[in-house]
């Protein structure tokens, strides 16, 4: 029977009737109903970044479930991304302390990667897809990565990819990991959308496929409150990764982690050790069946992630927003849409009726004549400054139509999807402006021009 030490401690505390002369200020009462379970680091409650008691026991339960050392984050995968990049920097500085570390990164990274590169003074070499592609996707093959590493003037501290990506494409993690290890570097994976991959009948989790470290947003696909996430470390990673994981998380994390989220992660262990894998397998089959039915109906689907349905909207005669509005009218709320795609995320917490209702709603949308639209494809902007220098420069916000030739200071993209079209330090060209305008970005933050 899987234990839940964090929940058990807090339930006992709630029943004790103790006078709360500690934070938080609500003292366990309030309008929302969950305040009694919201505590701080009192005696016995442990401390997330110095865990030795109930939190450590819960993390050990998670480690057993994932088959590798696992550490909790109450600040999403963003915290775990910064932490694993910091650990890669530590490992690289042991070899070459004199130079800023270099990371090869697939271009469709989350903007947290860019901010981490600025904070950690990382040089980035971007990996692009071999043929065009949407800014949300960047399929890097093992062959292309091997060629890039072979041609590199210096060995990178790590290779960083996003898999699954926002559109549901899963990379060849095993192939990429093999290339990285043969070339003497590490593979880090932003697996924010794929925590559930470990619990499929055959695991597709990055650490099981050879990644040295990855982050999972537990809250995205598991029964966990928003903000709950994991940092996973492979047993084959450099020793500094496990030894320094808590230090890395503490460097970027809040000193007030949410005990509500920690309880949610604790409860998830019991779910994952119980009926979750069977329910996941059943829902994956239902999702695949719906995908086949939609394709037979004429919809164009993309991606191979088992718990995500991504429809290319243009061939049906709509924008992604147009399809999303039809779903909203049917009482269905999708994860994401843009001018080209509609993304829907499914989990075992959905019901069979939910899937049937989604299928009926989509198939009731009449097909229209597809318009001939030339999509602006992301280019390869030229960098004028290092990421850190651009982020730390005086900056101003200007309309995108006036931005050609200026240097981007901030990545200028919301969440979702939080994937930048241009990156800090790059010169904004006409193609970037077309992309900004196409995706509804009306202004951007650029470095200030200094007179004289």
Model-predicted regions and their roles:
Residues 2-11, 50, 75-300:
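Conserved PLP-enzyme active-site core in the AAT-like
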Residues 35-79:
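Conserved N-terminal alpha-helix of the aminotransferase class I/II PLP-enzyme fold
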Residues 70-71, 124, 334:
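Generic structural signal for residues in well-ordered beta-strands
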Residues 69-70, 99-103, 421:
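Short active-site oxyanion
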Residues 292-441:
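Conserved C-terminal alpha-helix-loop-beta "cap" of PLP-dependent enzymes
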Residues 103, 362, 437-452:
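Surface-exposed interaction regions enriched in Ser/Thr/Asp/Glu
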Residues 1-53, 185:
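N-terminal "arm"/small-domain region of PLP-dependent enzymes with the aminotransferase-like
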């Amino acid at each position: 029977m899987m234990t839940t030490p964090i929940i058990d401690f807090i339930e006992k505390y709630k029943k004790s009737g103790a006078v709360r002369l500690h934070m938080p200020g609500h003292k366990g009462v309030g309008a929302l109903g969950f305040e009694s379970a919201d505590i701080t680091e009192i005696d016995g409650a442990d401390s997330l970044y110095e865990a030795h008691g109930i939190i450590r026991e819960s993390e050990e339960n998670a480690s057993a479930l994932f088959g590798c050392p696992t550490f909790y984050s109450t600040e999403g995968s963003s915290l775990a991304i910064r932490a694993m990049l910091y650990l890669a920097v530590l490992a690289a500085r042991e070899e070459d302390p004199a130079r800023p570390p270099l990371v090869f990164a697939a271009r469709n990274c989350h903007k947290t990667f860019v901010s981490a590169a600025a904070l950690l003074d990382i040089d980035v070499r971007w990996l692009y897809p071999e043929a065009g592609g949407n800014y949300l996707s960047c399929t890097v093959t093992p062959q292309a990565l091997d060629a890039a590493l072979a041609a590199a003037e210096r060995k990178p501290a790590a290779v960083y990819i996003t898999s699954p990506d926002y559109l549901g494409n899963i990379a060849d993690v095993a192939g990429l990991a093999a290339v990285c290890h043969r070339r003497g570097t590490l593979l880090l994976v932003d697996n924010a959308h794929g925590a559930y991959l470990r619990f499929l009948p055959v695991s597709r989790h990055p650490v099981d496929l050879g990644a040295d470290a990855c982050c999972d947003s537990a809250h995205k696909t598991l029964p966990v409150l928003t903000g709950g996430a994991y940092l996973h470390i492979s047993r084959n990673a450099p020793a500094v990764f496990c030894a320094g994981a808590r230090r890395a998380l503490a460097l970027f994390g809040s000193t007030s982690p949410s005990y509500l989220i920690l309880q949610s992660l604790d409860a998830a262990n019991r779910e994952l050790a119980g009926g979750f894998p069977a329910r996941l397998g059943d829902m994956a089959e239902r999702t695949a069946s719906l995908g086949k039915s939609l394709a037979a109906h004429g919809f164009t689907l993309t991606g191979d992630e088992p718990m995500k349905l991504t429809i290319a909207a243009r061939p049906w005669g709509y924008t992604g927003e147009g399809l999303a509005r039809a779903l909203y009218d049917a009482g269905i709320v999708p994860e994401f849409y843009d001018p080209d795609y509609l993304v829907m995320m499914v989990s075992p917490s959905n019901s069979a009726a939910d899937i049937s209702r989604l299928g009926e709603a989509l198939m009731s949308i009449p097909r229209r004549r597809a318009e001939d639209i030339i999509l602006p494809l992301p280019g390869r902007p030229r960098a004028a400054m290092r990421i850190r220098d651009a982020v730390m420069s005086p900056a101003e916000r200007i309309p995108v139509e006036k931005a050609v030739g200026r240097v981007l200071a901030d990545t200028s993209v919301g969440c979702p999807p939080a994937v930048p079209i241009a990156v800090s330090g790059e010169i904004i060209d006409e193609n970037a402006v077309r992309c900004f305008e196409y995706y509804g970005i009306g202004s951007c933050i650029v470095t200030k021009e200094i007179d004289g």
